[in-house]
């Protein structure tokens, strides 16, 4: 059975069809350097991911299976990591894994799903993408008997499992820490979001629900951050908002629904000398944690267990191809609040 050093017990949640949209391409500053790269080959839609070869297990249920790992966001650091973990684990079990990236193009993602279905892939893993956006193409996979798994995506009927974090709970955790511990229940806040992403939608729903409980906290603006270059775009957005709000203490905090815009916001604040403004994020990527440790404006994030999500997907695929019954729905990997006190 697949096990790549699981670090936590995963909880199974009831199946829930998420109505959100598409996962974020969280790219980090390496400006967006990736560990897994894709090179399209032929009509079979095979794509090769770079990286060290994993030791292969002969004769398992996954041996010889062709698995298509598909995402619109391979430039995202966390998406790239998940795709890499999945590729490594499945190849260790003898599967042939094709990582397919559509570079933020969802029409292309739909087309590529059609191609892998028609070419006879044995399984699909949708990474960091809302299945509602490609529901018709996934239905073709379901009709063809091809199992579809999600990794930090949404879940729709017909899929096997989506491994993710409890995004609403993460939103509650970081928003209450921001409002209570960092803002003291009063002030003004900017919301940096990307509501096409199903996880971000849930985090922002938590923000929207909780801010109603705080009459002394005012939302200045909600700003959409594009997924392609979120650090740079968030930096520009916040720089413009600082120009429009030049007085010290006119902005108390920036809530970023994932770490890349939090990093961009922090850069803008540092350049403007606005040390009084608080920033929080979600994901727990290395650059964000370093900024927290260094005592910058970025004060907290929620660290997701992306490796744990990949482990869940691979274990569930192993069970599926072994003929074992899978309890369909969402499975959650636990998340952790990171502050300067516990940042490592």
Task: Give residue spans per PLM region.
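A residue-level marker of the well-folded mature domains of exported/periplasmic proteins
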Residues: 2-12, 25-344
């Amino acid at each position: 059975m697949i096990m790549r050093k699981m670090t936590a017990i995963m909880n199974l949640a009831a199946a829930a069809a998420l109505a959100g949209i598409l996962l974020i391409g969280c790219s980090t500053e390496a400006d967006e350097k990736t560990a897994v790269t894709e090179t399209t080959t032929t009509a079979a839609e095979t794509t090769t991911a770079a990286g060290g070869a994993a030791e292969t297990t002969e004769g398992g249920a996954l041996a010889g299976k062709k698995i298509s790992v598909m995402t619109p966001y391979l430039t995202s650091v966390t998406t790239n990591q998940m795709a890499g973990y999945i590729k490594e684990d499945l190849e260790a079990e003898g599967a042939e894994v094709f990582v397919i990236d559509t570079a933020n193009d969802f029409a292309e993602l739909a087309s590529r799903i059609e191609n892998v279905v028609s070419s006879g892939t044995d399984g699909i893993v949708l990474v960091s993408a809302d299945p509602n956006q490609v529901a018709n193409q996934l239905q073709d996979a379901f009709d063809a008997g091809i199992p579809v798994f999600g990794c930090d995506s949404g879940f729709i009927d017909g899929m096997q499992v989506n491994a993710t974090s409890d995004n609403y709970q993460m939103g509650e955790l970081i928003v209450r820490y921001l409002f209570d511990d960092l803002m003291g229940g009063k002030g003004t806040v900017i919301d940096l979001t990307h509501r096409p992403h199903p996880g971000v939608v849930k985090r922002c729903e938590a923000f929207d629900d909780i801010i109603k409980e705080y009459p002394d906290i005012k939302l200045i603006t909600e700003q959409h951050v594009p997924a392609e270059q979120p650090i740079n775009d968030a930096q520009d957005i916040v720089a413009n908002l600082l120009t429009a709000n030049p007085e010290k203490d006119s902005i108390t905090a920036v809530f970023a629904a994932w770490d890349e815009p939090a990093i961009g916001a922090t850069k803008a604040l540092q350049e403007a000398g606005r040390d009084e403004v608080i920033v929080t994020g979600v994901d727990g990527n290395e650059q964000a944690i370093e900024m927290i440790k260094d005592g910058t404006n970025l004060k907290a994030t929620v660290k997701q267990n992306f490796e744990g999500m990949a482990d869940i997907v691979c274990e569930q695929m192993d069970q599926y191809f072994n003929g074992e019954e899978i309890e369909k729905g969402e499975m959650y990997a636990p998340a952790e609040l990171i502050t300067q006190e516990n940042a490592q």
